[in-house]
């Protein structure tokens, strides 16, 4: 667990890191971050609580408790990952643990959108390829350098062509996934727009 506070920002071209494998279909958002942790006033503490109940239940042998995975940043999952409630806390918890990209068979739509909105790309692969990658990552440390533009995961031994929605790809390459930075970089346009909105005249005074 890195609890990395260097969060994604602006255009993202590449993501490098070690893979961590989490096996199981239909892993829902309540398993990713249990409901009792949603009372937090910000997301900063969520990283330590990701998969809290699963980790407690199997007492230290969860992939997120393994010392071998403490610096992992690329999560490999199975089908329908992130189903259940639409809580944005789930991708926020994963990001604060250190996850910067997810490769899976499929994702719940809202979870996918919430990931994109905070700079975590979600790639898809066929079932057998996911199983192969999970097996490799469990046997030995598996590292990838992922090219967003090429939708390609590479290392010294092999490469894997990933599936990534073209609309999402462009958001990452252009940095437009990052709404906050986009707004801050265009304050002049915002101020100009305010001049033409009569119901915001109090801001101009």
Positions of PLM-derived features:
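Acidic, glycine-rich flexible loop/linker segments
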Residues: 119-204
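Generic signature of intrinsically disordered, low-complexity segments enriched in small/polar residues
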Residues: 15, 40, 54, 67, ...
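Short, acidic Gly/Pro/Ser/Thr-rich loop/turn segments
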Residues: 27-29, 58, 169-170
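Feature captures the catalytic cores and cofactor-binding loops of soluble hydro-lyases/lyases
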Residues: 2-7, 33, 40-143, 147-148
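N-terminal, positively charged, Ser/Thr/Ala/Gly-biased leader segments
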Residues: 1-35, 179-205
């Amino acid at each position: 667990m890195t609890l990395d506070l260097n969060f994604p920002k602006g255009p993202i071209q590449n993501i490098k890191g070690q893979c961590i494998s989490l096996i199981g279909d239909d892993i829902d958002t309540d398993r990713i971050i249990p409901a009792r942790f949603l009372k937090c006033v910000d997301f900063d503490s969520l990283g330590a609580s990701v998969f809290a109940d699963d980790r407690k239940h199997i007492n230290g042998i969860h992939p997120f408790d393994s010392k071998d995975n403490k610096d992992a940043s690329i999560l490999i999952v199975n089908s329908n990952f992130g189903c259940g409630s639409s809580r944005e806390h789930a991708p926020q918890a994963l990001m604060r643990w250190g996850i910067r990209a997810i490769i899976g068979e499929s994702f719940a739509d809202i979870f996918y959108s919430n990931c994109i909105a905070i700079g975590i790309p979600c790639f898809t692969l066929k079932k057998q390829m996911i199983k192969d990658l999970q097996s490799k990552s469990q046997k030995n440390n598996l590292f990838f350098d992922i090219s967003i533009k090429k939708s390609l995961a590479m290392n010294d031994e092999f490469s894997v062509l990933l599936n990534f929605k073209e609309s999402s790809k462009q958001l990452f390459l252009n940095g437009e996934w990052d709404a906050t930075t986009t707004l801050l970089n265009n304050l002049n346009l915002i101020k100009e727009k305010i001049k033409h909105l009569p119901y915001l005249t109090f801001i101009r005074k």
